[in-house]
């Protein structure tokens, strides 16, 4: 099981997420738990590596326009950002 590490920006982003419907918040928790256990995400989450400024990171789509950016290094799951595509990539 990976140790969790949250970036300061992720903490700010997450404050917005907790205002979403509870089912979305639960889904975020389920995705993070799956990653923390080291299990592979279901195909529906479209997990893939990133390039450019985010090289070395991955993202997955918790919902169609709710993206989680993360990185796994040694025994740590680093949660970098969470939000819509436009918030994260524009």
Question: Residue locations for each model-derived region?
Answer:
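Basic, Lys/Arg-enriched alpha-helical interface segments
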Residues: 1-64, 72-78, 88-90
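Short beta-strand-loop-alpha-helix junction that forms the active-site gateway
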Residues: 83-87
């Amino acid at each position: 099981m990976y140790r969790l590490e949250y970036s300061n920006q992720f903490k700010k982003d997450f404050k917005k997420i907790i205002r979403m419907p509870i089912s979305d918040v639960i889904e975020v928790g389920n995705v993070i738990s799956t990653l923390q256990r080291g299990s592979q995400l279901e195909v529906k989450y479209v997990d893939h590596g990133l390039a450019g400024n985010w090289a070395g990171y991955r993202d997955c789509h918790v919902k169609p326009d709710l993206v989680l950016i993360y990185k796994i290094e040694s025994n740590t799951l680093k949660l970098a950002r969470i939000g819509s595509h436009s918030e994260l990539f524009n």
